[in-house]
Regions:
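Active-site loop/lid in soluble adenylation, ligation, and acyl-transfer enzymes
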Residues: 1-129
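Coil-to-beta-strand transition motifs
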Residues: 19, 92-94, 177-180, 192-193
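Short histidine-centered catalytic/ligand-binding loop motif
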Residues: 37-52, 134-161
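A short glycine-rich, hydrophobically flanked beta-strand micro-motif that places a catalytic Asp/Glu
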Residues: 72-81, 174-189
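Conserved metal-phosphate-binding beta-hairpin within the catalytic cores
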Residues: 99, 180-200
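C-terminal helix-cap and adjacent tail motif
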Residues: 109, 200-226
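Phosphate-binding core of ATP-grasp and ATP-grasp-like enzymes
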Residues: 123-135, 166-179, 203-204
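A long amphipathic alpha-helix within ATP-dependent nucleotide-binding catalytic cores
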Residues: 149-181
Length: 226
């Protein structure tokens, strides 16, 4: 296998069969030794975090595939903390797709003059460029089309997939007595332009509350698999 990309929390290898292998690491983003999923640099190492991230990703990707929603997931190997995935091209230089069920975080910082903290949102979808230097700026549907990053049809497909996937995750959290406030995803497309969910679904990609209190990502992982 050939190492093709070294990421903050995962390394990517090209396999002989044309697929790719994601190696989940115990490195997490943060600052000054404090875990913060919103940071853009590795801040510390937490033993076992790669394993729990892979297990949650495996759980949800299988559930999403079973619902008829396409992902790049092939199989996971918990012994070496890896996941085999189908090849996929990212949109532009990478996009993050956020689905919001309540007004918190950056949404509240932007629009706090118009909405109350924690107000319900109707599975509101927004997209941002993955650009650390520019603070991951928001981009509209029209902007993505004008820039040639995706078609209107692809945007609508992603928005629909995002709402469906978010409901799957939200329902699962609700069954465990927790509430999903928001979650972020990444998407790619195959040689035929067909959209698929890529990367991971792990505790660091979502904001979950219990009895009105925010649950830290590592605690969420423990509660989820309890």
């Amino acid at each position: 296998m050939k190492l093709v990309y070294t990421g903050k929390t995962k390394n990517v290898f090209e396999m002989e069969n044309g697929n790719y292998l994601l190696k989940f690491k115990d490195d997490v983003t943060g600052k000054d030794g404090v875990f913060d999923p919103g940071m853009n640099e590795v801040g510390l190492t937490i033993e076992g975090v790669g394993d729990v991230n892979l297990r949650m990703t495996d759980y949800f990707f299988k559930k999403i595939n079973a619902a008829g929603i396409r992902t790049h997931f092939v199989q996971a190997n918990f012994d070496d903390t890896t996941m085999e995935v189908l090849p996929a091209k990212v949109f532009g230089k990478g996009l993050e797709v956020i689905c919001r069920r309540r007004a918190v975080g950056s949404f509240l910082r932007r629009y706090g003059d118009y909405i109350e903290d924690g107000a319900e949102l109707p599975y509101y979808v927004e997209m941002t460029f993955k650009d650390d230097a520019k603070g991951d700026p928001l981009v509209t549907r029209e902007g993505l089309i004008v820039l040639g990053i995706m078609t209107g049809e692809q945007y609508d497909t992603i928005a629909d997939m995002t709402r469906r996937i978010t409901k799957i995750v939200a329902d699962d959290m609700a069954d465990k007595g927790m509430e999903l406030y928001d979650i972020k995803f990444e998407y790619g497309y195959d040689a035929n332009g067909e959209v698929m969910l890529i990367d991971e679904i792990a505790s660091g990609n979502m904001r979950v509350y219990k009895d009105g209190e925010y649950i830290q990502p590592m605690e969420l992982s423990e509660l989820f698999f309890k």
